């Protein structure tokens, strides 16, 4: 039987669901940026809305102060954030009535400020065992997810003009666009966001050079085996004070390792570039998960800078605390459906995780895919039907990715046309590939081509997929190579 020593308090869990759907529901890049801003700040907006309504929530959980159920119960606050991580928010309220009042404020704020962000709320009576309370919260959260239905806060009539993608009522016309309430709020959030060093997607996609610089990359990075680490940090403790302190330290450390330091490294890396193409913007960044959109030419620099920062951090950590992650890169034109492109990036990340799990999730992997002519299948189907036996992806970061980059730089000496011919010959058959290798070797003996090198063969195929954006020389160099 659970010990009821929670001073009448309740512990609540808030979980934003369908985050990617909310962000990528539109293909307008301003609204994607605005949607990501709203999601990033949704809990902060809740705290401010609650304060305006006279509900005091102590959200200063990062200060390092110890948490105590008794101290909270005797404080002047109505609620206190236990910790926030992975898109989840844990709060303790003084009573169930306070929890209900807070939810009413939160719901109204979501409707007025975001329109359709969906948040699942669950609460349990506080006991003296945090781990048991958290387990009950997760179970309740899962139950709500599986049984609840997502409602859209609008109704339409036969005379109502609706958005053709979301079927929400049109409330405003701006810049020759018909906008729903959700779109208006996302654009408003976009206009307010002007973080120095990160570019708006209009700048990233190169709208001024449509057709030549309109390639974007969606990069999804996710930490390996993080659920095990969360369990490990509270393995031999159960009280609220001990567990909360441990989880707060873990959440802050995770954010620094997977988001803050890598983002700083990416900014520093791209600042070295002067071609105007190397720009990026965060879409989601929290805990061990990060989603970026950048000019496709910058994707390789972004990923290498990210993992360099992660490796640098690991040098000062003991083996059992080192952090590892996998990244997926999906490249597409700026007019492609972003929701589909994101799913490909997520599946590329999962492709790396499958390999990493075979090594106890202690290896970083990168996978990529160029969405050339629309997205009609999932990654697994694409690999099985179009690239089986041809690709070496995913790449282990420290050795295999470096080898891939070196091979791409070395083979650029033979020119774009020859690299493309080699990849096309692989698809036709082994004899075609051997013929092309011998032909090119006769002109470029220093290129190191060998028709019997299976590893190099797969590298060449992968290089050909992204040669134009990651390895291509200038037009003058290409002309000289073909002469």
Where are the predicted features?
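Regulatory and interdomain segments flanking nucleotide-handling catalytic cores
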Residues: 1-483
């Amino acid at each position: 039987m659970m010990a009821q020593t929670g001073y009448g308090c309740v512990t609540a869990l808030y979980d934003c669901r369908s985050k990617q759907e909310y962000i990528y529901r539109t293909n307008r890049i301003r609204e994607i940026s605005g949607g990501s801003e709203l999601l990033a700040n949704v809990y902060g907006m809740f705290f401010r809305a609650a304060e305006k309504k006279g509900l005091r929530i102590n959200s200063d959980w990062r200060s390092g102060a110890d948490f105590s159920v008794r101290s909270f119960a005797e404080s002047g606050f109505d609620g206190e954030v236990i910790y926030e991580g992975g898109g989840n928010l844990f709060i303790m309220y003084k009573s169930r009535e306070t929890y209900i009042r807070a939810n009413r404020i939160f719901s109204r704020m979501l409707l007025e400020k975001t329109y359709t962000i969906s948040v699942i709320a669950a609460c349990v009576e506080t006991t003296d065992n945090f781990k048991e309370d958290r387990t009950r919260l997760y179970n309740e959260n899962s139950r709500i997810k599986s049984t609840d239905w997502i409602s859209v806060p609008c109704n339409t009539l036969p005379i109502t003009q609706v958005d053709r993608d979301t079927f929400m009522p049109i409330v405003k016309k701006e810049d020759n666009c018909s906008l729903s309430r959700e779109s208006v709020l996302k654009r408003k959030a976009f206009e307010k966001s002007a973080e120095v060093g990160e570019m708006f997607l209009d700048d990233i996609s190169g709208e001024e050079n449509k057709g030549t610089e309109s390639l974007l990359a969606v990069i999804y990075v996710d930490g390996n085996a993080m659920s095990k680490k969360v369990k490990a940090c509270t393995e031999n403790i159960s009280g609220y004070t001990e567990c909360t302190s441990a989880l707060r330290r873990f959440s802050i450390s995770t954010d620094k390792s997977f988001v803050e330091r890598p983002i700083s490294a990416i900014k520093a890396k791209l600042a070295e570039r002067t071609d105007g193409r190397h720009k990026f913007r965060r879409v989601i960044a929290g805990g061990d998960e990060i989603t970026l959109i950048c000019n496709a030419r910058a994707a390789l620099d972004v990923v290498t800078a990210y993992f360099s920062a992660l490796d640098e951090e690991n040098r000062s950590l003991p083996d059992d605390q080192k952090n590892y992650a996998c990244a997926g890169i999906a490249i597409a034109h700026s007019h492609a459906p972003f929701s589909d492109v994101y799913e490909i990036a997520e599946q590329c990340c999962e492709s790396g995780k499958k390999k990493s799990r075979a090594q106890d999730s202690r290896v970083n992997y990168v996978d990529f895919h160029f969405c050339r002519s629309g997205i009609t299948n999932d990654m697994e189907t694409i690999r099985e039907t179009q690239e089986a036996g041809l690709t070496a992806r995913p790449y282990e970061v420290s050795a295999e990715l470096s080898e891939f980059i070196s091979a791409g730089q070395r083979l650029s000496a033979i020119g774009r046309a020859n690299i493309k011919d080699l990849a096309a010959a692989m698809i036709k058959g082994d004899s075609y590939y051997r013929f092309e290798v011998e032909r090119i070797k006769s002109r470029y003996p220093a290129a190191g081509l060998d028709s019997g090198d299976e590893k190099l063969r797969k590298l060449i195929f992968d290089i050909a997929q992204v040669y134009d954006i990651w390895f291509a020389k200038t037009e003058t160099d290409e002309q000289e190579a073909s002469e």
